[in-house]
Amino acid sequence: GEKEIEKYLQKAETLLNTEDIQRDGYYAFVCEKCAPVFGYYGYFLTEQDLKQRARNIYERA
């Protein structure tokens, strides 16, 4: 149900925000693909943040 989805979204956000993971092209790809899911469930700020992270990484490459 809805509570379970919220739990998974929070877990995903926590993992994506982990400081010691490498911010590379793979991370950018994951952010880009996950962002719309957060938006679909109303986490619009997280969606925008993930899209921006991906853009920043792609611009550096």
Where are these regions (language model features)?
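Intrinsic-disorder-linked linear interaction elements in eukaryotic regulatory proteins
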Residues: 1-61
